[in-house]
A protein has these predicted regions:
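Active-site anion-handling motifs in enzyme catalytic cores
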Residues: 1-251
Length: 251
């Protein structure tokens, strides 16, 4: 497949590999796809069919497919995507939507038979023992910013960094606060790496504002990040799961 795809790339012909090796699925009855990021358009309006087609291959082997904790759509800006996903989603054995926007959108596509609504699974993750908000002087605001979401709003990382750096300056000036940068996703893909993105914002700031900011520059994991979140009075989050992390520790 890789050879075929490479050859076609020289001809500028896109080729989607629909599935990988399937030996590992022998003996399984059900496969869960957790989260809904693959069921949205990219910031440039494109879509990737690789994983959905792979999951359809599993269904052809008699394995049920459940999409759990999903946010889906919208696809109207890309008619090919709308047609593909409308057909694909109708095949899924169960779609568990995590919020009402997805619920209403899928109903508008007449996808009612295999649809239900339930809280995001992140709400059920157990907190570390005795994890309670810390008492301190002054205001600490935790901020999570995502290059992925910024691309949807601004179109380029450079523009987003400049605009959001200015927003951080205004926040510190008006609230007289300290800021804790909370990266949620650390990815090899720079366009999806919160830490690299927030470091770029930090580097844009004047020194006197940098002195009021601390960056979590490690990867403590989903649960480990809660220990930093409880230091905050408020959290502003681009990533849904970072926001849920804050809610579940009463911030």
């Amino acid at each position: 497949y890789n050879i075929v795809r490479k050859c076609l790339s020289y001809l500028h012909i896109p080729y989607v590999v629909p599935y990988d090796k399937l030996d590992w699925v022998v003996g399984f009855d059900t496969v869960f796809s957790i989260g809904g990021d693959i069921y949205t358009l990219a910031s440039n309006g494109s879509y990737n069919a690789s994983l959905p087609l792979f999951l359809e291959q599993l269904q052809q082997r008699g394995i049920k497919y459940i999409l759990w904790g999903a946010s889906v759509g919208k696809f109207e800006e890309n008619h090919l995507a709308l047609r593909f996903f409308s057909h694909h989603l109708s095949k899924i054995n169960l779609i568990v939507s995590r919020e009402s926007n997805t619920w209403e959108y899928l109903q508008s596509l007449n996808l009612n038979a295999n649809l239900c609504l339930a809280p995001d699974p992140a709400f059920l993750v157990k907190n570390p023992v005795n994890l309670v908000p810390e008492q301190h002087e002054g205001i600490i605001i935790g901020i999570n910013l995502s290059p992925l979401s910024a691309l949807y709003e601004y179109g380029s990382i450079e523009e987003a960094v400049a605009i959001q750096a200015e927003a951080v300056i205004r926040l510190i000036e008006r609230r007289g606060c300290e800021v804790l940068f909370l990266p949620h996703v650390l990815s090899p893909d720079k366009s999806d790496n919160d830490l690299l993105y927030m470091k770029a914002i930090y580097d844009k700031l004047p020194k006197n504002f940098q002195d009021k900011i601390m960056i979590i520059d490690s990867d403590p994991g989903f649960v480990g990040l809660k220990r930093f979140i409880v230091k905050c009075d408020y959290v502003i989050a681009a990533r849904m799961h970072c926001a849920i992390n804050a809610i579940t520790v009463s911030v």
